Amino acid sequence: MGTVDLSELVAFTYYARKPEFEAKGIGVRQVEDGLREQIDGKSTVFMIARTETKLIGWMVLLPVSQTKLQINLDYLIDGRPVIDPAYSQHVLEKQLIQMARVWAGENDYQEIIGKLMFHGRALAEDKSENYESLGFRPEFVYVGMECDLMDFESPDIVIPEEISIGELEQASERDLRALFFEAFRCGDTAFFRDLTDAEIDDYFDSLGYQDALEQKGSIILRGEAGRLLGFSMVLAFEETTRHISCMCIHPEFQGKGLGKLMLQVMMQKIIADGIEKLTLGTEQAMRAYQLYASYGFRVTWGEVMYSLTGGKYKS
C-alpha cells in the first residue's frame, strides 16, 4: 500500500512503458488524460512498490461490485502492473499481486479479477505465471478482431423464405434488450456467466443503441409471424471503419445458419457504404469466433481474464 500523486504516476508510467507508448504514438499528455479518466471519481486502491528514494512499481485495484475487485484499469497500461524496467518484472509483479490478495481478504472481497493483455502475439506467449502461481485460474480469452473489407469478396446470399431482414429501428429497444438478455444468458459466453440481471442490463446500455440506429449494418432478423430472431448493432469508429458492438441470435435458433446470414448481410451493407475496415470483439471459445475467422477477421489484440475466488487471499 502507499500513496502517489497523479503527476508522479504519469511520469513513472511513461518512463516504464516508453518504448510501447512511442510505438503506439502515445505521448505524456495522453497518458495523463487516460489515467485521470480512469481514476478520477472512482474508488481505487493503489498497491505501490518503492525504494527509499523512488517509485519502482504500481498497480491499482478497482472495485466493480461489493464483492469483486479488478486488478489494474484498462487498455492504456495493458492490464498489468507497471514496473520500472531496471527491476525484475516477475518479482515485483508477484509482490504487488500478493499485496492485492491480502488487501482483498482484509476487506471482505470474494473475487479478484486480473487481466493480461496481448497485442499481435500468439496466446501461448502470454501465459501469466504470476497470476497462476498465486492461485488465479484462467477464465476466458477475449479478443479484438478486424477484417479488411477491401479484400473481401461478398458471397451470394440466400435468404430463407421464412426469414425477413429489416433495419434496427424496426424493432423496439425493449424487444432488442429482451432478446439480448436471452441470447447471452443462455449462450456460450463466459463473460455473462456470473453477471446479475442488472449487470447484463447495464451492459446492453453500453452497446450504443442510439448511435447504431444511424449505421448501415445495424439490422434485425424476423421469422415466422414476425418473431424477432436476431439483431446486430454497428457503430462508426472512424470515417472508413465500423465496429460491430453486438450481434446475437435467439438461443432457440442458434446453430441454424442465421449468424452466418446476418454477418453476410451486414458486411454487404457496410461495404456498399464505402467502409474499408470492420472490427469486433468476442470470446475466443465462442462458436462465433470461428464464424468471424472464416470471413477474414483476424485477431489484433486480446486479454486473458484470470479469477481468484473463495476466501483464499490471506495464504
Segments (PLM) and residue ranges:
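A short beta-loop-alpha structural element at the N-terminal edge
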Residues: M1-T13, S164-F180, G187
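Conserved GNAT-fold acetyl-CoA-binding loop/helix
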Residues: Y14-G34, R185-S206
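Conserved donor-binding loop and adjoining core beta-sheet/short helix segment
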Residues: E20-F21, G25, R29-E106, M117, ...
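Short loop/turn motifs at secondary-structure junctions and domain boundaries
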Residues: R36-G41, G208-Q215
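Acyl-donor-binding surface of acyltransferase catalytic domains
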Residues: P85-E162, V304-L308
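Conserved hydrophobic beta-strand within the GNAT/NAT acetyltransferase core sheet
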Residues: I112-L116, I244, L278-T282
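Active-site/acyl-donor-binding loops of N-acyltransferases
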Residues: S128-S154, Q264-Q268, A272-S315
